[in-house]
């Protein structure tokens, strides 16, 4: 039976990405359901930030030395609290230890591989500054992708969804896996 996949490998890839998506949902939802509460939105977003490292390729210039850590930066108000630290603690990306940094200025922002920007009124300015530097920019402003951001979180039917600006990724020399693009809305 052919379900529209060109190859068996493509079908396996799709199942793998949906498997990860389901694991994220179960990971954050099951404890909450046992307490008759919903999983905090930012716990889900923290899991996404971690998993982006598995579906994105960065340019070689993203790291100064072979020993640099993989940095997930939070610029501006930190909505994640302990969730992002717990999610990243002890993990690796691209064979490098992952670290979370609360970024306070653009000089520190350019050291990040993933940069979550939560600075109302300053987002466009920050995006212009980090453009083309091999940084995966992530935000939740409704206009994030139109301002040049790469991945935007948004909610639809109480679910966290993704919108991806492929052109902005290309301009930053970031390659986003087709597996991630399949579960996202592509900004045009």
Functional labels for PLM-detected ranges:
Residues 18-32:
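Bacterial N-terminal signal peptides
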Residues 2-19, 34-188:
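Short hydrophobic alpha-helices and adjacent helix-cap/hinge residues
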Residues 1-2, 29:
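Short intrinsically disordered, low-complexity coil segments enriched in acidic
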